[in-house]
Each structure stands twice: as structure tokens, then as C-alpha cells.
């Protein structure tokens, strides 16, 4: 009788988990979920550096998890807004950073013929070091604003649940503050307040071992790239992007490879030099998987985790898209 009861209980639990997974929908948002946009500037007094940020605030008033986003080379806080809008509609405070020195100020006042040269020069070690220090500076200021009654962010932030994300140079920034070890020097810029990370167009180090760079990462990472994700600047090609996943050993890891997706797939518009037509389903997949990841690891949503750790993500993908995951 006891054995029969145990079997029935396990069957019921499996059925319940399956039902929760099948009903979970990372794309579902309410009609009243349009976020409020707040533009602010973080002043880093120690470095005398001003950092513009754009905050997508959800309609809820309770403290919500925070997701940071770092733009690619030449971008701004206004880029990839389709992500910020959706994440906020799902209940996250999405904070989009702008990094002076590697933002649109690099190219916008130059003749077209000079822009590529200027962008290449901005993809520098100096700007990398500025970026990885921008992230903790922003988190520090968010902690202050969260306690200031005069701030539009007062009481709105759950800073015990912080996700980090970024595209291209922003992915490099994300990797550095989320557990990467610099392959040559062994230096780390990890911010322990970050609990999960998404790298859009991740990169292996130019020199040194990817295994050394990523082998000690101990928080969940989601990696997204495309089969034609080659950056116009730098040496990051598809094999170097795929090497990141293989090098992660200690924490849950996920990888999406979108078929025929180019480097611009994670932005709002095509880039000069793109050869493939934009696939509208790519943004749907990006939003679904990133949201499920945040729900699982920032929202502690068991149904989202079960959905993510199953074949359900393939229901939003096209046949040739690739998906894999592992939990050590």
C-alpha cells in the first residue's frame, strides 16, 4: 500500500510539473503592462564620469528584480528597446546603460568614410576598463536611489536579484562583470551582486584559453548568437562565440544559435553590411528565452525553470535554430 501511494504521489507531482510547464508562457503580458520610461544620469564622482541610463519601469509598485543591459560599440541607452519594453512588461526594472567613449559619440559627427576607423579605435582596452567599472558604479547609484524618497526609483528595486546582459562589446562587458577571468592576466572584475547573466553575441578571449577565462563562472549564463554572427569590427567569429558555452563548467548554462542570424539580430534595426533579410521570429525567440531565464533565476519561478530545462523552448523556434542547456 505504501509503495502504491508513493507511486501515485510521484505520478501526481510529474503531472503537476508538466501542467505548469505547458501553461507557462514567457511572451504573455497584460494589456496594462506598458512600462514607464525614465532617463537618468549616474555621476561617478570617483572617476568624474557621467553615465546616461534609461530605465524601463514596470507598472507594479512593489520592489522588482533589476536587469542591466550594456550596449554594443557605438550604441546608446536607447538601443534594443524591444528587450527593455518586454522585460519591464514582465515585471523587471530594465536599466539600459550608456558608456561614453564607446557610444554613438564615437561616430555620429563624422563623415561616413571616417566612421569605421573611429569605431575600431574605440574598441580599446581603455574603453573596456571604463565599461567594467561603469557597471558597479550604476549598481551603487541604484542602491542610493532606491532609498531616496525623492527618486523615481525609490522603493522600486529588488537589488538582491540583479541580472546583467549586453550585446557585442556589451556582451564582453557582461562576461567580465559576471565571472570571467581575464585569460592572460588572471584579473577579475566580477560584481558579486549579479546573480545571472545573458550575453548576446558572446566572445572568447583574443589571447589565452577560453577554458581559463570561463571555467570558474559560478552563476547561470544564457548565451545567444547566430550562425552568421560576425562582427564588422574585431576578430569575433561564430566558432569563438560557440567556444564560450563549452568552457562553462560550474553553473547552469544555456545556448541559443539562431539560424541565419547576423550580428544585428539583437538590435532594433539592420546594420550596414547585413546580407540576410530580418527574420521577425528571431526577436520572438530572443524575448521568450531571455524572459524565461530571468523568470527562472531572478523571479524564482519553478514553472519557468521547468520550461527552460525542457524541449519547450523549441516551440517558439524555427526548425534550424539550435538550443542546448546543461546544469552541472
What are these model-derived regions, one by one?
Residues 14-16:
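N-terminal signal peptide c-region/cleavage motif recognized by signal peptidases
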Residues 138-216:
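Primarily recognizes the serine-hydrolase "nucleophile elbow" in alpha/beta-hydrolase
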Residues 20-62:
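N-terminal cap/lid segment of alpha/beta-hydrolase-fold proteins
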Residues 69-73, 167-168, 202, 226-227:
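Glycine-rich His-Gly loop
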Residues 186-260:
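The feature captures the conserved acid-bearing segment of alpha/beta-hydrolase catalytic domains
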Residues 259-328:
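Alpha/beta-hydrolase-fold serine-hydrolase catalytic core, especially in secreted/extracellular enzymes
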Residues 47-157:
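Serine-hydrolase catalytic machinery in alpha/beta-hydrolase-like enzymes
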Residues 121-126, 208-210, 273-284:
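Active-site rim elements
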